[in-house]
UniProtKB/Swiss-Prot annotation:
Gene: rplR
InterPro entries: Ribosomal_uL18_bac-type, Ribosomal_uL18_bac/euk
GO molecular function, one term: structural constituent of ribosome
Keywords from the named record: Ribonucleoprotein, Ribosomal protein, RNA-binding, rRNA-binding
Taxonomic source organism: Halorhodospira halophila (strain DSM 244 / SL1)
Keyword Ribonucleoprotein: yes
Family that this chain belongs to: Belongs to the universal ribosomal protein uL18 family.
Pfam families: Ribosomal_L18p (PF00861)
Protein name (Swiss-Prot/TrEMBL): Large ribosomal subunit protein uL18
């Protein structure tokens, strides 16, 4: 089993558990250059809030897009947008990635900005 297949298998298991709980899902996707976050409905059909380092406003504020400080900015921004959409409580879907580095920085920044998970 290659690295991507193993990550997708881990992600599928956690997404199934989140779907059973019926909570809004804060999902994270990362690439070497960018990090993306979105809040989805429990069934995964609709995205209610999204933020990423691809956005021009975030690109100008941070020194790079593939680092921990950029992930923290995305975490703060996704929390603000989720709260504006009326969402306070979410389940964190790390997408099969380790809870370390940029994924951890995004999660902690979202918690500090008032999102509960």
């Amino acid at each position: 089993m290659d690295k991507k297949t193993a990550r997708m298998r881990r992600a599928r298991k956690s997404r199934g558990r989140i779907r059973d709980v019926g909570a809004y899902r804060l999902s994270v996707h990362r690439t070497p250059r960018h990090i993306y976050a979105q809040v989805q409905q429990p069934d995964g059909a609709t995205t209610l809030a999204a933020a990423s380092t691809v956005e021009p406003a975030l690109r100008q504020r941070s020194e790079g897009t593939g680092n921990v400080s950029a992930a923290q900015e995305v975490g703060r921004l996704i929390a603000e947008r989720a709260k504006a959409a009326g969402i306070e409580q979410v389940a964190f879907d790390r997408g099969g990635y380790q809870y370390h580095g940029r994924v951890q920085a995004l999660a902690e920044a979202a918690r500090e900005a008032g999102l509960k998970f």
